[in-house]
Amino acid sequence: MAESNADVYASFGVNSAVMSGGSVEEHEQNMLALDVAARDGDDAIELASDEVETERDLYDNSDPFGQEDDEGRIQVRIGDGSEPTDVDTGEEGVEGTEGSEEFTPLGETPEELVAASEQLGEHEEGFQEMINIAAERGMSVETIEAIQREYEENEELSAESYAKLAEIGYTKAFIDSYIRGQEALVEQYVNSVIEYAGGRERFDALYNHLETHNPEAAQSLDNALTNRDLATVKAIINLAGESRAKAFGRKPTRSVTNRAIPAKPQATKREGFADRSEMIKAMSDPRYRTDANYRRQVEQKVIDSNF
């Protein structure tokens, strides 16, 4: 069966509404009502899908990583030079603290030190008695002094000295036993003094300070230790502690903007105690415990004393 014109138009998507009417205006209106794909000669305009990525605006100042996790990233801030930049090195600042600790004056002499001093004194009295007996048994004073000097210099006795002592009844075993006992008591006494002063490190620091800045006081301390004069030992150690605290315990106040003008040196007259009883009386004064200036004056007079 032959196709009609309407069937032919329908195969191209043209319905009867397009063909209806006899005027050109009516035909145009019917064509506009159809899908654009069905219009012969018209170009279809398609809009881009939202899924297509658009190019980022070159002037967009937003942070492209603003929504990302910062973990694992290193942030670097570049300064413009208008503000100082603090750099954290991970280390805390440490100021020099050499000698910055405050010195606490020594208090009452501990019983352990007093006991050690007394035991050493008793042993020395026994040694003097041995010397007297040696002299009574015929040993000359020159020989006794030579044996003493030999031990002080060499810290031991020669075979010749042992032989001379054996001649007057002092065997080698007896002499060695006596020497060991003497050394043990001396060590106990010295350790007690060091502990009283605050320990080995503190005692060495104070003694070295005296040797450097006041050699006379250092020698006075040696003499006081040898004579077991605990009052003088205490006074000199306190003086050394206060002197060292002044030298190292305070921050310097002079700077390039505060120039120090040296004062004219003035001679100071030093006068010590007349005797030991006068020194003990001054130390027994209540001000010695409560008044730092008074205590310092007393300690200085101890050093300047000649007894």
UniProtKB/Swiss-Prot annotation:
User: Which interval of the chain is the signal sequence?
Assistant: none
Q: Which organism is it from?
A: Escherichia phage T7 (Bacteriophage T7)
Question: Where is the stretch described as Disordered?
Answer: 45-105
* Compositionally biased intervals (Acidic residues): 45-54, 83-101
Q: What is the documented function of this protein?
A: Scaffolding protein involved in the icosahedric procapsid assembly. Coassembles with the capsid proteins to form the procapsid, in which the scaffolding protein is found within the external shell of icosahedrally arranged capsid protein subunits. In a subsequent step the scaffolding protein molecules are released from the procapsid. Facilitates assembly by binding to gp10 hexamers but not the pentamers and locking them into a morphogenically correct conformation.
What is the name of this protein? Capsid assembly scaffolding protein
Keywords for this entry? Viral capsid assembly, Viral release from host cell
Q: Does the keyword Protease apply?
A: no
Biological processes, Gene Ontology terms: viral capsid assembly
Q: Pfam families per the record?
A: Phage_T7_Capsid
| Family designation | Belongs to the T7likevirus capsid assembly scaffolding protein family.
Higher taxonomy: Viruses, Duplodnaviria, Heunggongvirae, Uroviricota, Caudoviricetes
